[in-house]
Amino acid sequence: MACNLSPMRKFHPYAVAAEKQGKKIYHLNIGQPDIATPPAYFDAVKNFELPVLEYAASPGMPILIKAVQKYYEDLGIHYEESDILITTGGSEARQMLMLSILDPGSEVIIPEPFYPNYNTFIKSAGGTIRPLTTTPEEGYRYAFREKLEALINENTRAIMFTNPGNPTGVVLTHDELRTIADVAKEHDLFVIGDEVYREFVYGGEKLATIGEFDDISENAVIIDSVSKRFSACGARIGTIITRNKLLQQQLLKFCQARLSVATLDQVASAALYDVDSEYFDAVRREYKLRRDTCYAKLLEIPGVVVTAPQGAFYMMAALPVDNADTFQQWLLTDFDDNGDTVMFAPGEGFYATPGKGRNEIRIAYVLKQADLERAMDLLAIGISKYNETH
């Protein structure tokens, strides 16, 4: 199995070398939120008083499963406790799911650009990605019946997408999700909604979810996580939710093989689900401000093509450069402006189609507004100087 280096992390050695030279790097390459984790998490850890830190149950601790169940009840979606499995982060959820539904040669339809680790999870299960290519000029939208059906063959097992989108920030409408659900139902495919950014939608609308459609309950799978929602990436708590009992049985085998998810992280994460909705209101306002800052600054750079993201905290942008990988390396090794430089995730690694995304980048707007403004200025200066010599 050959897997590519992560576009978010592969330039880390160059960044370390640049920092040793005294350069300050504005990191836009990884979606690590700087928003404070709610105190409820740490309070729950401090108040944990059992005399023995035992293994938790393999499917997850009841206190956390019930918290997740209530969260979806409040959204108007009922799941039984047995429909919910707790995982060690969203990454384990994706890995277990691919191992459960794919055979060697199986294919998963995924709109590209996509979260690069999907490639690793699918390849490790013997499958391949069947990409549905989107473009910045079309706003990276992909829920078109004719395009989806053109990719389906006898090896297709699932349609998988992130909603809101990573790396594009695209938010699917109810009608778009209905289209995907109908295609999945008619062709008996799993439809996998990776909804780890569901709280971060900036138009004021309620996020549509694949869990809304009762007629595809046997096909639908939701992947969720506390990492981004509660700014608790280090907690490593994820969720797989499906009403498909055969799939649940297969997933449970993997849960039992890895024994259990960390007890303390589950206890503390359960407390996060009691956080007041005002927390999310404040976080959304902050991310919307950051999005607007980045988007406005990018529009000022000649030759940049960018669409305002509707959700999550990422945006893709096409740059007037020949190769974003080469450009990023140059920014770290040969460029600075008053000792400052910038780091993003080159776009080619977010595509399965060879050559696609070569001049694109993903920006994670997870810095304070003033830092984002400086980072965008550095990007503009860098593009100008790079194109003078390349």
Task: Show where each model-derived region lies.
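N-terminal small-domain helix-loop-helix segment of the aminotransferase-like
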Residues: 2-89, 96, 147, 272-275, ...
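Helix C-cap/helix->beta junction micro-motif
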Residues: 18-21, 125, 186-187
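PLP-dependent enzyme catalytic core of the Aspartate aminotransferase-like
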Residues: 78, 149-150, 330-343, 350-390
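Conserved PLP-anchoring active-site segment centered on the Schiff-base-forming lysine
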Residues: 100-122
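Active-site PLP attachment segment
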Residues: 212-250
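Structural signature of PLP-dependent enzymes
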Residues: 249-255, 273-295
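Conserved glycine-rich beta-strand-loop-beta hairpin in the small C-terminal domain of fold type I
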Residues: 270, 286-295, 306-319
